[in-house]
């Protein structure tokens, strides 16, 4: 490896070609789809959950790089682009993903813009103390223009946490929710059916969704708190946009067809327009 290479992303500084914007979807499979809608798409590297492409939009170079799921892998992506590759404070990092709404009025297919995140992720504590806010740091005027152009329906606070207990899931096994405190999930572990109950030892998240709803939190996801905390504390600019694939007041797991159509419409088309407004 040359000195300019990074351990996980497999990129060199030269690969960026002066890019000052990095679009960061979670899913590696979305990266090529996003890059293909822009000019001169080039695949740079693919290693584990990190797939990276470079493309041009209105003559300006940008990077599309997946983060994988959750805060720790997301932090690697931010660290290796911003620190090792020397991306400066002009850099915009729009986090693009899918999400579950927790407010009844938010519909599947809606576009949400996060202004701040509830830091339930854990990883963000490695970059700033809990008292430090996880806030959007995009330039206000351009961010406002981007919100209008992508048809954002709701702007507000997001909760970043784990997929199961942090987002208070009970019915993943498919059983009816009769009594939350007694419902368990059955998982196949080492080819044997064993009973597993997320809430049998730590109960702090029982009833938490209703508390977040009362405080006006609009959705759950798993990465924005890490991205926003890291960038805000290091003088970088970042924002979060997400397409709603399920409303948690109605069901816990999204319908497969709904998820596919929402991802296709949102992640591949809307993000390019948002990037154009932010460049």
From Swiss-Prot:
Q: Which UniProt keywords apply?
A: Cytoplasm, Glycosyltransferase, Transferase
Pfam families from the xrefs?
PNP_UDP_1
**Subcellular location, record wording:** Cytoplasm
- The enzyme's main class, written as a single word, is transferase
Q: Which reaction does it catalyse?
A: uridine + phosphate = alpha-D-ribose 1-phosphate + uracil
User: For this UniProt entry, what is the primary localization, expressed as one broad class?
Assistant: cytoplasm
Pathway field of the UniProt record reads:
Pyrimidine metabolism; UMP biosynthesis via salvage pathway; uracil from uridine (phosphorylase route): step 1/1
Q: Which InterPro entries match?
A: Nucleoside_phosphorylase_CS, Nucleoside_phosphorylase_d, Nucleoside_phosphorylase_sf
Q: Which CDD domains match?
A: UP_EcUdp-like (cd17767)
Q: Which GO terms describe its molecular function?
A: uridine phosphorylase activity
The entry describes its oligomerization and partners as: Homohexamer.
Function, as annotated, reads: Catalyzes the reversible phosphorylytic cleavage of uridine to uracil and ribose-1-phosphate.
The similarity annotation says: Belongs to the PNP/UDP phosphorylase family.
- PANTHER family attached to this UniProt entry: FI09636P-RELATED, URIDINE PHOSPHORYLASE
What is this protein's name? Uridine phosphorylase
């Amino acid at each position: 490896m040359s000195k300019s290479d990074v351990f996980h992303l497999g990129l060199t500084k030269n690969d960026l070609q002066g890019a000052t914007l990095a679009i960061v979807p979670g899913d590696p499979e979305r990266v090529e789809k996003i890059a293909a809608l822009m000019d001169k798409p080039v695949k740079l590297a693919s290693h584990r959950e990190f797939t990276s492409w470079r493309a041009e939009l209105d003559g300006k170079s940008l990077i599309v790089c997946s983060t994988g799921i959750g805060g720790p892998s997301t932090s690697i992506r931010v660290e290796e682009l911003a620190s090792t590759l020397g991306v400066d404070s002009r850099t915009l990092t729009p986090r693009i993903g899918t999400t579950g709404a927790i407010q009844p009025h938010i519909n599947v297919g809606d576009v949400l813009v996060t202004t701040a995140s509830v830091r339930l992720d854990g990883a963000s504590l490695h970059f700033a103390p809990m008292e430090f806010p996880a806030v959007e740091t995009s330039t206000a005027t351009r961010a406002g223009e981007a919100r209008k152009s992508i048809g954002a329906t709701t702007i507000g606070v997001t909760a970043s946490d784990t997929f199961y207990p942090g987002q208070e899931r009970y019915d993943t096994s498919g059983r009816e929710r009769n009594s939350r405190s007694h419902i368990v999930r059955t998982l196949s572990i080492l080819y044997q059916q064993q009973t597993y109950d997320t809430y049998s030892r730590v109960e702090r998240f029982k009833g938490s969704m209703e508390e977040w709803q009362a405080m006006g939190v609009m959705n759950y996801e798993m990465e924005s708190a890490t991205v926003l905390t890291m960038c805000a504390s290091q003088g970088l600019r970042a924002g979060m946009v997400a397409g709603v694939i399920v409303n948690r007041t109605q069901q816990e797991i999204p319908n497969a067809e709904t998820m596919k159509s929402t991802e296709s419409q949102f992640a591949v088309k809307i993000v390019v327009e948002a990037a154009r407004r932010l460049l």
